[in-house]
């Protein structure tokens, strides 16, 4: 299934007789633009590994266009400013055909505007979830394999309502991701009959959020909803909120999920903390992926790792379908391999997919 900006669902879903010397297949460069440093650095390694796992499977099953995938990793630091030069290196210096990434929405848009779109390069983010990506003027080059926060915000609001929460204090990181998610959450929570007693934005990367916490605590709500990053604002705000003792229950979103969130915090002080993230895959493809990841020593439930695998596999399928490592035509090829109708390709079924593509059979 393919919905532009864009959601690519889990799809994973010629020889020429000549007397001349044989033409050797060339390797294909595909980038992974990950936020390896910055506020989601604790989330990044499994996401990179998920994309690399897809490439490793392609290489083990005959390769791409007869050659091998060579992956090149860049660091966009979850920062639109840093993402530009990092993407420029992949696009113009390394000359990748396409790339997976970035991971944060701001970095994804920054990479696209600075290098991806001007370079006619397809990119698929496994985790950029802000609604702002949907309206990006991208020449049909920017895609994602995770749902928009237009969906996550609704689910977060519904979760709180189901738990009997009627009022919250909300703080969100002041960027496309944070504001987009907060806006959707507030609208749905209020539609459910809830009250947002305080709605305070914050800047990421600060050492002290006590002023913001003072505003939030002043609302009188005992429930704090935190939209931020595990290795950045979310950890610091949570730690200082626990120290202040003004809140009894904490809620978060996908960005707060990470090993760094509870560093130095007594788990007993945040007992009952709940967070939303992209739902677990279900069905036959999900079970196949779980086995593939487990056999490779990876955690199949790691946040956005399945979506990264999906992104990497889809790019490889699109390049094979396109018939060359050229950037031209790749976006259209991606839509062909990721959309119905067609024979379903499960995770790991690279050799099968190549046979079908060569036979002119539609795949999905």
Model feature map: region roles:
Residues 19-25:
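Sec/Tat signal peptide C-region and signal peptidase I cleavage site
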Residues 1-2, 17:
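Long, low-complexity, tandem-repeat intrinsically disordered regions
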Residues 2-6, 10-11, 25-364:
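Extracytosolic ligand-binding ectodomains
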Residues 9-19:
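Bacterial N-terminal signal peptides
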């Amino acid at each position: 299934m393919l919905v532009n900006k864009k959601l690519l669902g889990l799809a994973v879903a010629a020889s020429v007789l000549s007397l001349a010397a044989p033409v050797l297949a060339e390797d294909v460069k595909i980038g992974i633009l990950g936020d390896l440093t910055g506020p989601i650095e604790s989330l990044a390694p499994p996401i990179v590994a998920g994309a690399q796992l897809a490439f490793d499977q392609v290489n083990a099953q005959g390769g791409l266009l007869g050659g091998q995938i060579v992956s090149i990793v860049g660091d966009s630091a979850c920062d639109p400013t840093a993402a530009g030069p990092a993407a420029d290196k992949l696009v113009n210096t390394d000359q990748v055909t396409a790339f997976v990434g970035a991971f944060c929405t701001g970095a994804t848009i920054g990479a696209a505007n600075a290098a991806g779109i001007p370079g006619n390069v397809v990119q698929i983010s496994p985790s950029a979830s802000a609604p702002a990506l949907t309206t990006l003027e991208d020449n049909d080059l920017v895609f994602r394999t995770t749902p928009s926060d237009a969906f996550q915000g609704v689910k977060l609001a519904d979760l709180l309502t189901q738990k009997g929460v009627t009022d919250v204090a909300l703080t969100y990181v002041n960027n496309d991701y944070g504001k987009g998610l907060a806006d959707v959450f507030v609208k749905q929570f209020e539609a459910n009959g809830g009250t947002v007693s305080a709605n305070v934005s914050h800047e990421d990367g600060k050492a002290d959020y006590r002023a913001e916490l003072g505003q939030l605590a002043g609302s009188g709500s005992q429930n704090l909803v935190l939209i931020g990053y595990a290795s950045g604002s979310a950890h610091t705000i949570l730690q200082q909120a626990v120290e202040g003792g003004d809140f009894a229950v904490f809620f978060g979103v996908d960005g707060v999920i990470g090993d760094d969130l509870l560093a130095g915090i007594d788990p007993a002080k945040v007992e009952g903390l709940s967070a939303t993230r992209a739902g677990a895959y279900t069905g036959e493809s999900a079970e196949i992926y779980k086995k593939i990841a487990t056999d490779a020593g990876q955690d199949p439930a790691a946040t956005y790792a399945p979506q990264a695998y999906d992104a990497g596999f889809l790019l490889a399928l699109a390049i094979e379908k396109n018939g060359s490592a050229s950037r031209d035509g790749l976006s259209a090829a991606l839509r062909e391999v990721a959309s119905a109708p067609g024979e379903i390709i499960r995770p790991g079924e690279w050799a099968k997919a190549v046979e079908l593509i060569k036979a002119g059979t539609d795949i999905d």
